[in-house]
Amino acid sequence: MNIVCLDMEGVLVPEIWIAFSEASGIPELRRTTRDEPDYDKLMTWRLGILKEHGLGLKEIQDTIAKIDPLPGAKAFLDELRATTQVIILSDTFEEFAKPLMEKLGWPTIFCNSLEVAENGEITGYKMRCEKSKLTTVKALQSIGYDTIASGDSFNDLGIIQASKAGFLFKSTEQIKADHPEIPAFEEFDDLLAAIKAAL
């Protein structure tokens, strides 16, 4: 049995932190896992900047409410979900993902959660498990699933390499150059065809 595991940001929706960086006028928040592979380091740094500027969950959610899925993402996901089982694996947080999942037709997402004070300040975050994407893929494999994975970033390489088929999608030139063995696509139709061929 097959199950497709997709990254969310950069694959199905724009990068939330880049959108928030532009909305808030804080260029430092543009850094993502494409730039910093150590997610804990990246999140600790982000939370420090939010605190410094007095920004909390509400401000980020206001930005997320204005974000639409990437053009073609919902049609791609609809067709893929009609063909096989799909789970979105993301390092994002439930508090960020919900409005985006609604716009994508409520696919299943495995992600993390934020710790938020009563005043809306984001005080920390709770990862579902260590190396959550790779741990999830290995768990799915342990219960009889063959995984097919796609993502755009450093933190997707583990699931791509551990799966029976894996693809980079809308990735950086650096990651593509470092991993020429991984097929890379820019268009949803091409990714859909590659996934269907791997089923």
Region roles according to the model:
Residues 1-2, 150:
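Short loop/turn microsegments at loop-to-beta-strand junctions
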Residues 2-113, 117-118:
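Alpha-helical substrate-recognition element adjacent to the catalytic core
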Residues 78, 138, 157-158:
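Alpha-helical segments flanking ligand/cofactor-binding loops in enzyme cores
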Residues 86-91, 145-186:
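Acidic, Mg2+-coordinating phosphoryl-transfer loop and its flanking beta/alpha structural elements
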Residues 95-147, 178:
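Substrate-recognition "cap/lid" segment bordering the active-site pocket of phosphatases
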